[in-house]
């Protein structure tokens, strides 16, 4: 810290002595100023000392690429200053990562739209599967239990639920039977199920004249034309959809009959509603 000062030589004259004193004072002033500045620097160093730590009590400094070390346990207390031009502040392939992220998002969105986009649910009325006939002779009434068959096709990539099937049968513009089935089944993705439903019908009262026709022995086949109406309600993702169809169908009211599905026994008068 301190500096050693050399002894000044004695001067022979007053002028030389004066000059010597002046020079000595100036030199002392410079020395004191230098000492003061040096003390100030030492004070700064004492406040912010630079210490190099080595050994087991230090870890590699993450901001100086391994050239310096900081005490272990102080990683969360020290702050490192990194130049703005440091390459670590400019990650490589940023554009590539952004483009890849955008591409992945678009791909996932496209797949979600493709698989979740609602597609049609096809309902095909196959025909009458069977008809069981009974009579009430006193009331001249005909009872027909008609079993029909539907094919329901799910064209979606997710399951749909057949919530209910509502059916009715008309004869000569008069409703002679109704039926409703609830909570039918669940159809898987791209799957098809065949569903049978039975509609009990009654031909009586103002149509009692049909009793004579249906019980006439001289006729082997007692076909009557009935209009079959069916509405299928399906649900998926909280959305309900109804598909309706109407068909005219021949039914034998003179005997119990089982029909071969696929062989045309009905008249396709009305097209299914789209």
Curated annotation (Swiss-Prot):
Recorded topology in the membrane: Single-pass type II membrane protein
GO cellular component: endosome; late endosome membrane; lysosomal membrane; lysosome; plasma membrane
Transmembrane intervals: 97-117
Compositional bias of kind Low complexity: 1-11
Major localisation: membrane
Residues with Phosphoserine modification: 33
MF annotations from Gene Ontology: ATPase binding
Source superkingdom: Eukaryota
InterPro entries, per database record: TMEM106, TMEM106_C, TMEM106_N
Region: Disordered, residue numbers: 1-20
Residues with lipidation of kind N-myristoyl glycine: 2
Residue numbers on the Cytoplasmic membrane side: 2-96
Lumenal topological domain residue ranges: 118-274
Swiss-Prot/TrEMBL keywords: Amyotrophic lateral sclerosis, Cell membrane, Disease variant, Disulfide bond, Endosome, Glycoprotein, Leukodystrophy, Lipoprotein, Lysosome, Membrane, Myristate, Neurodegeneration, Phosphoprotein, Signal-anchor, Transmembrane, Transmembrane helix, Transport
Compartments it resides in: Late endosome membrane; Lysosome membrane; Cell membrane
GO BP, one annotated term: lysosome organization
Tissue specificity field: Expressed in the brain, including in the frontal cortex (at protein level). Expressed in lung epithelial cells.
Disease / disorder: Frontotemporal dementia 2: A form of dementia characterized by pathologic finding of frontotemporal lobar degeneration, presenile dementia with behavioral changes, deterioration of cognitive capacities and loss of memory. Gestural apraxia, parkinsonism, visual loss, and visual hallucinations are present in 25 to 40% of patients.
Oligomeric form and interacting partners: Can form homomers. Interacts (via N-terminus) with MAP6 (via C-terminus). Interacts (via C-terminus) with the vacuolar-type ATPase subunit ATP6AP1. Interacts (via N-terminus) with AP2M1 and CLTC. Interacts with TMEM106C. (Microbial infection) Interacts with SARS coronavirus-2/SARS-CoV-2 spike protein (via RBD domain).
Family assignment from sequence similarity: Belongs to the TMEM106 family.
Stated role: In neurons, involved in the transport of late endosomes/lysosomes. May be involved in dendrite morphogenesis and maintenance by regulating lysosomal trafficking. May act as a molecular brake for retrograde transport of late endosomes/lysosomes, possibly via its interaction with MAP6. In motoneurons, may mediate the axonal transport of lysosomes and axonal sorting at the initial segment. (Microbial infection) Plays a role in human coronavirus SARS-CoV-2 infection, but not in common cold coronaviruses HCoV-229E and HCoV-OC43 infections. Involved in ACE2-independent SARS-CoV-2 cell entry. Required for post-endocytic stage of virus entry, facilitates spike-mediated membrane fusion. Virus attachment and endocytosis can also be mediated by other cell surface receptors.
Protein name: Transmembrane protein 106B
Gene name linked to the record: TMEM106B
């Amino acid at each position: 810290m301190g500096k050693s000062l050399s002894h000044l030589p004695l001067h022979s004259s007053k002028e030389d002595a004066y000059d010597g004193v002046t020079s000595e004072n100036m030199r002392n002033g410079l020395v004191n100023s230098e000492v003061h500045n040096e003390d100030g620097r030492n004070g700064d160093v004492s406040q912010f000392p630079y210490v190099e730590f080595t050994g087991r009590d230090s870890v590699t400094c993450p901001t100086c690429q391994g050239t310096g070390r900081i005490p272990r346990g102080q990683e969360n207390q020290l702050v490192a200053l990194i130049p703005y031009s440091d390459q670590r502040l400019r990650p490589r392939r940023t554009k590539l990562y952004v483009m890849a992220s955008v591409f992945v998002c678009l791909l996932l969105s496209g797949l979600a739209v493709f698989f979740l986009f609602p597609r049609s649910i096809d309902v095909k009325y196959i025909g009458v599967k069977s008809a069981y006939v009974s009579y009430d002779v006193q009331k001249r009434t005909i009872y027909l239990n008609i079993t029909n068959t539907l094919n329901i096709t799910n064209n979606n990539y997710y399951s749909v639920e057949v919530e209910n099937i509502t059916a009715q049968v008309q004869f000569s513009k008069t409703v002679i039977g109704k039926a409703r089935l609830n909570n039918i089944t669940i159809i898987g993705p791209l799957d098809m199920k065949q569903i049978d439903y039975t509609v009990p019908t009654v031909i009586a009262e103002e149509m009692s004249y049909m009793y004579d026709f249906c019980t006439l022995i001289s006729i082997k086949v007692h076909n009557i034309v009935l209009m079959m109406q069916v509405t299928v309600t399906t649900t998926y993702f909280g959305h309900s959809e109804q598909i309706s169809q109407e068909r005219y169908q021949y039914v034998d009211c003179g005997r119990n009959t089982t029909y071969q599905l696929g062989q045309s026994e009905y008249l396709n008068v009305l097209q299914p509603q789209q």
